Amino acid sequence: MSKKVVEVKTLKVGKYVIIDGEASKITNISTSSPGKHGSAKARVEAVGIFDNQKRSFVKPVDSKVDIPIIDKRTAQVIAIMGGDVQLMDLETYETFETPIPDELSEQLVEGVEVEYIEALGQRKLMRTKG
């Protein structure tokens, strides 16, 4: 489980953050100053990478949050088994299975190279190469 800790004020739209134990892509950040003596608060809205659920949190801008270390890799399709696909990583030659996203179901054939991401022990197929 690779992650690092940063302050909320360094987060940007399009980057990733861990909310409720899930890696999520930030879709919106808004900050507000509550008053004369209060510290600024940030509201961060994000969508889960692996489950597509909307999540959000409100924290002071100087508080710390975890961000995932996302590893983008290339793999080759070995076999297609119903709703799952068996892939082999082209660097480590490790084989694993992952669900097929709806938008890639027509493009996947055996032998084609694909890109996938790995974060917090989970993998997701992103797109075909070429």
UniProtKB/Swiss-Prot annotation:
Extract the GO molecular function terms from the UniProt entry. Answer: ribosome binding; RNA binding; translation elongation factor activity; translation initiation factor activity
GO CC terms in record: cytoplasm
Signal peptide start and end residues: none
* Keywords noted in UniProt: Cytoplasm, Hypusine, Initiation factor, Protein biosynthesis
> Where does this protein reside within or beyond the cell?
Cytoplasm
Q: Which PROSITE patterns match?
A: IF5A_HYPUSINE (PS00302)
> Is the Protein biosynthesis keyword given for this protein?
yes
Q: Name one GO biological process term.
A: positive regulation of translational elongation
Q: What InterPro entries does its record include?
A: IF5A-like (IPR001884), IF5A-like_N (IPR048670), NA-bd_OB-fold (IPR012340), Rib_uL2_dom2 (IPR014722), Trans_elong_IF5A_hypusine_site (IPR019769), Transl_elong_IF5A_arc (IPR022847), Transl_elong_IF5A_C (IPR020189), Translation_prot_SH3-like_sf (IPR008991)
The record ties this protein, via Pfam families, to:
eIF-5a, IF5A-like_N
Q: Which residues carry this modification: Hypusine?
A: K36
The text of the family note is:
Belongs to the eIF-5A family.
Please name the NCBIfam families in this protein's record. eIF_5A, PRK03999.1
Function of the protein: Functions by promoting the formation of the first peptide bond.
The protein here is known as Translation initiation factor 5A
UniProt organism field: Methanothermobacter thermautotrophicus (strain ATCC 29096 / DSM 1053 / JCM 10044 / NBRC 100330 / Delta H) (Methanobacterium thermoautotrophicum)
